[in-house]
């Protein structure tokens, strides 16, 4: 029972880390990476479709993304979707779409850093909520006399260690992201 609670909690914590990594991939760093365009939706025959389903997105060089629509007729629609995605990007269109990454100003870097810190804090809160749920489940088992007080204390210590591990992971990911943001 205790192991099930810990495993379930740890799975939820892993999902929180995945969400954080996904959020960090969308934070603009001045360097080109395909994840930046993952939230772009293209109007494809009247339906909003994710960009990666109508075009391939590749890194041409460190500051340029190359977007190649699968259908030539989609070039204008993809270009329009990227412009309207509110990412501050200005694609150049020919047969393929080149998306140059504008250099980040100091102010933009600070804003992106604040955004990254906010995402990290949300993840920490989520991890702590999972810890609280796990501890409540353990206390419930102890209250119903299904586990001893020693087992409860041991499980609580284990849960705290798991929580500390994931919080440290969030902190290291944030530190790496901030370092990446401040590189010129």
UniProtKB/Swiss-Prot annotation:
Keywords: Cytoplasm, Protein biosynthesis
Signal peptide stretch: none
GO annotations of cellular component type: cytosol
InterPro entries: Ribosome_recyc_fac (IPR002661), Ribosome_recyc_fac_dom (IPR023584), RRF_sf (IPR036191)
Pfam family, one: RRF
Highest taxon above the source species: Bacteria
CDD domains in alphabetical order: RRF
Compartments where found: Cytoplasm
Function (record text): Responsible for the release of ribosomes from messenger RNA at the termination of protein biosynthesis. May increase the efficiency of translation by recycling ribosomes from one round of translation to another.
Family to which the UniProt record says this protein belongs: Belongs to the RRF family.
Name the UniProt record assigns to this protein: Ribosome-recycling factor
């Amino acid at each position: 029972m205790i192991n099930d609670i810990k495993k379930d909690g740890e799975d939820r914590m892993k999902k929180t880390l995945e969400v954080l990594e996904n959020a960090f991939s969308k934070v603009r760093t001045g360097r080109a990476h395909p994840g930046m365009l993952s939230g772009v939706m293209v109007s494809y025959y009247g339906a909003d479709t994710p960009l990666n389903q109508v075009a391939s997105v590749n890194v041409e060089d460190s500051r340029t993304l190359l977007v190649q629509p699968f259908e030539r007729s989609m070039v204008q629609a993809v270009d329009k979707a990227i412009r309207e995605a509110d990412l501050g990007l200005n694609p150049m269109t020919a047969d393929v779409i080149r998306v140059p990454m504008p250099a980040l100003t100091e102010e933009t870097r600070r804003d992106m850093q604040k955004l990254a810190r906010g995402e990290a804090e949300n993840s920490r809160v989520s991890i702590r909520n999972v810890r609280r749920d796990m501890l409540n489940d353990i206390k419930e088992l102890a209250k119903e006399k299904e586990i001893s007080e020693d087992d409860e204390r041991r499980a609580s210590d284990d849960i705290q260690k798991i929580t500390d591990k994931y919080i440290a992971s969030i902190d290291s990911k944030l530190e790496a992201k901030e370092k990446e943001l401040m590189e010129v």
